[in-house]
């Protein structure tokens, strides 16, 4: 009887553990565990604020630059961590980092032009960034891979 109770206790404890995905927090090697609730929130916010131009991790206005980790890491400065991606959502720059593009890319800096950005808090920006950075772990090459992964191939 005692062994059976221990078995149920172990089952109960493990059944209620939640999984998390690791994401780079900054350029210093900091790592954060992103909980499922945060990912859901980030996905919802991404879909309502970003997906009209970035569906599936692509960039409709420039297909050469996606939201995949390779593209983000090759930007100047690199945008492959939470802090850097949130900074971009506040003050976007060109891929080489030389000019502000706040007048043409939705951002907190241009919320007067892009009203959807007005209601986003700092926590919201981090949730969106977490969604973007975890998608390569969830969708692999489909995230940012473009239409070759989403079109039906005929035989």
UniProtKB/Swiss-Prot annotation:
<keyword id="KW-0934">Plastid</keyword>
<dbReference type="InterPro" id="IPR036909">
    <property type="entry name" value="Cyt_c-like_dom_sf"/>
</dbReference>
<keyword id="KW-0813">Transport</keyword>
<keyword id="KW-0249">Electron transport</keyword>
<feature type="binding site" description="axial binding residue">
    <location>
        <position position="54"/>
    </location>
    <ligand>
        <name>heme c</name>
    </ligand>
</feature>
<feature type="binding site" description="covalent">
    <location>
        <position position="50"/>
    </location>
    <ligand>
        <name>heme c</name>
    </ligand>
</feature>
<dbReference type="Pfam" id="PF14495">
    <property type="entry name" value="Cytochrom_C550"/>
</dbReference>
<keyword id="KW-0732">Signal</keyword>
<protein>
    <recommendedName>
        <fullName>Photosystem II extrinsic protein V</fullName>
    </recommendedName>
</protein>
<comment type="similarity">
    <text>Belongs to the cytochrome c family. PsbV subfamily.</text>
</comment>
<dbReference type="InterPro" id="IPR009056">
    <property type="entry name" value="Cyt_c-like_dom"/>
</dbReference>
<dbReference type="GO" id="GO:0009055">
    <property type="term" value="F:electron transfer activity"/>
</dbReference>
<feature type="binding site" description="axial binding residue">
    <location>
        <position position="105"/>
    </location>
    <ligand>
        <name>heme c</name>
    </ligand>
</feature>
<feature type="signal peptide">
    <location>
        <begin position="1"/>
        <end position="20"/>
    </location>
</feature>
<dbReference type="GO" id="GO:0005506">
    <property type="term" value="F:iron ion binding"/>
</dbReference>
<keyword id="KW-0602">Photosynthesis</keyword>
<keyword id="KW-0479">Metal-binding</keyword>
<keyword id="KW-0408">Iron</keyword>
<dbReference type="InterPro" id="IPR029490">
    <property type="entry name" value="Cytochrom_C550"/>
</dbReference>
<keyword id="KW-0349">Heme</keyword>
<keyword id="KW-0604">Photosystem II</keyword>
<dbReference type="InterPro" id="IPR016003">
    <property type="entry name" value="PsbV_cyt_c550-like"/>
</dbReference>
<comment type="subunit">
    <text>PSII is composed of 1 copy each of membrane proteins PsbA, PsbB, PsbC, PsbD, PsbE, PsbF, PsbH, PsbI, PsbJ, PsbK, PsbL, PsbM, PsbT, PsbY, PsbZ, Psb30/Ycf12, at least 3 peripheral proteins of the oxygen-evolving complex and a large number of cofactors. It forms dimeric complexes. The extrinsic subunits in red algae are PsbO (OEC33), PsbQ', cytochrome c-550 and PsbU.</text>
</comment>
<dbReference type="GO" id="GO:0022904">
    <property type="term" value="P:respiratory electron transport chain"/>
</dbReference>
<dbReference type="InterPro" id="IPR017851">
    <property type="entry name" value="PsbV_cyt_c550"/>
</dbReference>
<comment type="function">
    <text>One of the extrinsic, lumenal subunits of photosystem II (PSII). PSII is a light-driven water plastoquinone oxidoreductase, using light energy to abstract electrons from H(2)O, generating a proton gradient subsequently used for ATP formation. The extrinsic proteins stabilize the structure of photosystem II oxygen-evolving complex (OEC), the ion environment of oxygen evolution and protect the OEC against heat-induced inactivation. Unlike the T.vulcanus ortholog, it does not bind by itself to PSII, but requires all extrinsic members of the OEC.</text>
</comment>
<dbReference type="GO" id="GO:0009535">
    <property type="term" value="C:chloroplast thylakoid membrane"/>
</dbReference>
<feature type="binding site" description="covalent">
    <location>
        <position position="53"/>
    </location>
    <ligand>
        <name>heme c</name>
    </ligand>
</feature>
<keyword id="KW-0472">Membrane</keyword>
<dbReference type="GO" id="GO:0009523">
    <property type="term" value="C:photosystem II"/>
</dbReference>
<keyword id="KW-0150">Chloroplast</keyword>
<dbReference type="GO" id="GO:0019684">
    <property type="term" value="P:photosynthesis, light reaction"/>
</dbReference>
<dbReference type="GO" id="GO:0020037">
    <property type="term" value="F:heme binding"/>
</dbReference>
<keyword id="KW-0793">Thylakoid</keyword>
């Amino acid at each position: 009887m005692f062994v059976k109770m221990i078995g149920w206790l172990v089952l109960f404890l493990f059944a209620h553990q939640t999984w998390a995905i690791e994401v780079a927090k900054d350029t210093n090697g900091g790592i954060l565990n992103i909980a499922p609730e945060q990912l859901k929130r980030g996905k919802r916010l991404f879909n309502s604020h970003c997906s009209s131009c970035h569906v599936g991790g692509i960039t409709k206005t420039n297909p050469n630059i996606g939201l995949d980790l390779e593209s983000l890491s090759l930007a100047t400065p690199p945008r492959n961590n939470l802090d850097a991606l949130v900074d971009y959502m506040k003050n976007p720059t060109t891929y080489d980092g030389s000019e502000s593009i706040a007048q043409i890319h939705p951002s907190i800096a241009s919320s007067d032009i892009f009203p959807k950005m007005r209601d986003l808090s700092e926590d919201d920006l981090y949730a969106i960034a977490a969604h973007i950075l975890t998608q390569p772990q969830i969708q692999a090459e489909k995230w940012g891979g473009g239409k070759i992964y989403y079109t039906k191939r005929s035989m």
